[in-house]
């Protein structure tokens, strides 16, 4: 997908509102979308994913970007986290951004300390390693960086979980029954 400059500006504005972390990010986004009703479904999905990418990877992105402004954090998240190429976001970049974005593309994340790579506070990573192991602490950090799965509850008065699972799979969704709930589906 090629984000438009308007989508990039809206994502930057939403990140700017979410970064102070005065309210839960989903509440900030809900308010942002209610005041920006002209945004379409695709725009909203892009903005939400970008905001949550910035928040999940905040420590890493701040390490990679000198003077981390919301605009730079959005660009860094798109390049390093979401895998966008510079060509996909070049209409949003200023001429002064060329050097740091090129350096960002080649930045060696593996050379950074594990806590920074995983966007965890040092004290938390050290405590996880002390209480478990470095491997388990890394697995925990990686899990925290992933997008959460969507769990749905089937209304058993109107549908059967097995049939809903088959319908979702037939529609191309990777759906599975939940482990603990007999009426849940994880997408």
Q: What is each PLM-predicted segment?
A:
Residues 1-187:
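Class I Rossmann-like S-adenosyl-L-methionine
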């Amino acid at each position: 997908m090629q984000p438009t400059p308007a989508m990039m500006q809206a994502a930057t504005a939403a990140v700017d509102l979410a970064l102070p972390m005065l309210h839960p990010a989903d509440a900030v986004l809900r308010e942002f979308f209610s005041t920006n009703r002209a945004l379409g479904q695709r725009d909203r999905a892009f903005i939400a994913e970008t905001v949550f990418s910035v928040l999940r990877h905040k420590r890493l992105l701040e390490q990679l970007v000198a003077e981390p402004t919301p605009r730079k954090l959005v660009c860094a998240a798109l390049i390093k986290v979401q895998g966008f190429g510079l060509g996909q976001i070049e209409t949003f970049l200023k001429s002064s951004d060329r050097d740091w974005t090129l350096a960002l593309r080649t930045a060696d994340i593996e050379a950074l300390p594990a806590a920074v790579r995983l966007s965890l506070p040092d004290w938390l990573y050290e405590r996880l390693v002390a209480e478990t192991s470095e491997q388990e602490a890394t697995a925990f950090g990686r899990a925290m960086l992933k997008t959460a799965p969507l769990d749905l509850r089937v209304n058993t008065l109107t549908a059967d979980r097995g049939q809903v699972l088959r319908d979702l799979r037939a529609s191309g969704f990777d759906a599975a029954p939940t482990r603990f709930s007999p009426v849940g589906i994880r997408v």
